Amino acid sequence: MSTSFPEGWYEPDEELHRQEMVEELQEEVGEGHVLKGLNVRLVARYRGTDDALFALDDGRIAQVHLTWSDEMETDPRFPATSVFPRFEAWLSFWNSL
């Protein structure tokens, strides 16, 4: 995804970092979570936080606050996730904050 992000968001340069973030998300997502079983790709991180943007295969974007709990979450509300139909919808939401 080649795009410009709002201030504070950045696109990680290293493939290893992107893969590690995807693996962390997959480890945390438990049964009933909106992202369980979906393929995702890291597109951006928010500096100084545990927030990340993931692209889904169908074009949707998920903003996720990772827990870094070292285990699968049992509550499907975690990691906290908001899913948007496309990047522009997320951007509009973010800019309204």
Each PLM stretch: what is its role?
Residues E7, E11-P12, G48, L56, ...:
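Intrinsically disordered, low-complexity regions enriched in small/polar residues
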